[in-house]
A protein has these predicted regions:
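Sec/Tat signal peptide C-region and signal peptidase I cleavage site
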Residues: 4-10
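Beta-sheet-dominated interaction scaffolds and their linkers
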Residues: 10-35, 133-147
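Extracytoplasmic
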Residues: 25-27, 39, 78, 95-97, ...
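Asparagine-centered strand-capping/turn motif at beta-strand->loop junctions
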Residues: 30-36, 152-158
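Soluble periplasmic/extracytoplasmic beta-strand elements of cell-envelope proteins
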Residues: 31, 41-45, 80-82, 99-101, ...
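Short, hydrophobic/aromatic beta-strand segments
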Residues: 38-46, 161-167, 219
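Intrinsically disordered, low-complexity Pro/Gly/Ser/Thr-rich segments with frequent PxxP/GP/PP motifs
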Residues: 54-89, 173-200
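Terminal connector regions
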Residues: 86-131, 199-237
Length: 237
């Protein structure tokens, strides 16, 4: 049995929530800690998002290796995982995203005892060398466009992914749309259905962007009727 988790459980703990792989780096690494008291097997691998490839991620051959891919960890032990790119077969004009899977396989216990494998997944962002722009400013490059009375569109024209939380669209303090989480890939657009807005009052779009360091940065945009606009950081008071 496999249990999926996005946060820490009594077992493996990763020292980061995302990995940024710069194209000119020979390798990147992250740490894993076995917070439990017993010995485990640690299995690690990369896969492409199914949405991006249209194929089963398990069948994809990627120009990366994770080492060690399988290793034993003592209770309380630590392990460094290395991700190495072979230097081929990745887009050179935009950032790519992969999933890093790290799975804890408990040692065999007594007969008739249920064993649960805990798996964590984090994103690996691969950035080719020489890409223009600043990824920390990518949320400000999103183009938000009002359409008819029941739609809003956001387009990412840049080469970087933008990860967002708590997207909210409001008009006169009435919420017209809410999305808990969304990642926009380079050149991707998203159509957001709205509860029917009324009159010509502006729309207020707010969201939280996750930066390279896992930090959460709030943004807000105000859109007049049938106009487009860009979001700005919400500065702390």
């Amino acid at each position: 049995m496999v249990s999926w988790c996005a946060s820490v459980q009594a077992g493996i703990v990763l020292n980061t929530t995302r990995v940024i792989y710069q194209g000119n780096d020979k390798e990147v690494s992250l740490g894993v800690h076995n917070s439990g008291g017993g010995e485990i097997l640690l299995q690690s691998w990369l896969e492409a998002p199914a949405l991006a490839t249209g194929n089963d991620p398990a069948t994809q051959r990627l120009p990366f290796i994770v080492t060690p891919s399988l290793t034993r960890m003592a209770g309380g032990g630590k392990q460094l995982l290395r991700i190495i790119h072979s230097g081929t077969d990745m887009p050179t004009d935009r950032e790519s995203v992969l999933w890093l899977n790290v799975q804890e396989i408990p040692q065999t216990a007594a007969q008739n005892t249920l064993q649960i494998a805990i798996r964590q997944r984090i994103k690996v962002f691969f950035r080719p060398d020489g890409m223009p722009g600043d990824p920390l400013q990518a949320p400000e490059q999103l183009n938000w466009k009002t359409g008819n009375n029941d739609s809003l569109q956001v387009e990412n024209p840049g080469p970087y992914h933008v990860s967002m939380l708590k997207i909210s669209v409001r008009q006169d303090d009435v919420e017209l749309a809410s999305i808990e989480s969304q990642m926009l890939a380079p050149q991707q657009s998203l159509h957001i259905p709205l509860l029917r807005k009324k009159g010509g009052a502006p729309l207020v779009v707010s969201f939280v962007s996750i930066n390279d360091y896992g930090g959460q940065v709030p943004y807000r945009a105000t859109l007049a009727n049938h106009e487009s606009g860009y979001a700005s950081k919400v500065m702390p008071r």
